[in-house]
Amino acid sequence: MSENLHPRADELDDLTAREFVGLMHAEDGAAVRAIAPLLDDVARAVEEIAERLRAGGQLHYFGAGTSGLVARLDAAECPATFGVDPEVVQAHAVEEPAQEDDRELGVEFARRAQLAQHDVAVGISASGRTAFVLGALAEATSSRALRVAITCHPGSALGRAADIAIEVETGPEVIAGSTRLKAGTVQKLVLNMLSTAVFTRLAHTHRGRMVGVVAGNDKLRARAILVVAGLSGSSREESMRALEAAGGNPKIAIVILRLGVVAEEAGGLLERSGGDLKAVLAAGRAHPA
């Protein structure tokens, strides 16, 4: 569908700049709204992915071209945002045009990923027929990994190959075939939902804060201080001291301040809870020292 001509294609060259960007804005809005009928499918994928990651699985994205770049973008942000190891969310992408047509290359990439039954393979393709991605999902079938498809073509081959199909009908692009536009935007929005909701359900956030943030620069260190102060009710100075004692780990710092324990005990409580800050704080309130 993204290859079809836009209804206003013949007049695009004659539009003013304001008319052109207004048209694109309207098209983007329509594409975003097209996700709404599929939210049940997105939510189902979130629940299934969270269940597998809770069991020690990994989340693998497979895409080519724009879809691959979108996959890489989402995967790259997960460690810093949620504090997960880079291996937990991995993007397997190709960029050369000829590679998109290579089904066996997709199979090879999936084999290298060593997919297992607790893992998740997410195939991303605007057309839903990219050979590289189809090959990857075919290999995922033999490993019993969960297969999720994100496409912009309802009834696609990729959707049929998946356990859960999220097929958002975005319609023709303003420039026919330019899937970096609406299709790429929608793919990123769906991946935003999947990764953010999954890691929130896995307790890598708390009350809308990045309690897993890895403070690798000044901006993130400042954010970590705000997170600790906001969730502990402590001053900036107290939060900084707790973070230092916690080795920069916001969750440990929050437990130190909220429960009045030392860093080693705070870390142990979190480890025994599987990193669930909410559970640790609730247990601390129920059983005060």
Where are these regions (language model features)?
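Cofactor-/ligand-binding subdomain signature composed of acidic, glycine-rich
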Residues: M1-L38
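Gly-rich Lys/Arg/Thr-decorated short loops/hinges at beta-loop-alpha junctions or inter-strand turns
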Residues: L23-A31, V88-E95, H206, G233, ...
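A short, well-structured juxtamembrane/interface segment
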Residues: P37-R54
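Charged, alpha-helix-enriched surfaces in structured cytosolic catalytic cores
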Residues: D40, R44, A131, T185, ...
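Glycine-rich phosphate-binding loops that contact phosphosugars or nucleotide phosphates
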Residues: L59-V190, T196-H204
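Short, amphipathic alpha-helical interaction segments embedded in low-complexity terminal/linker regions
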Residues: V198-A289
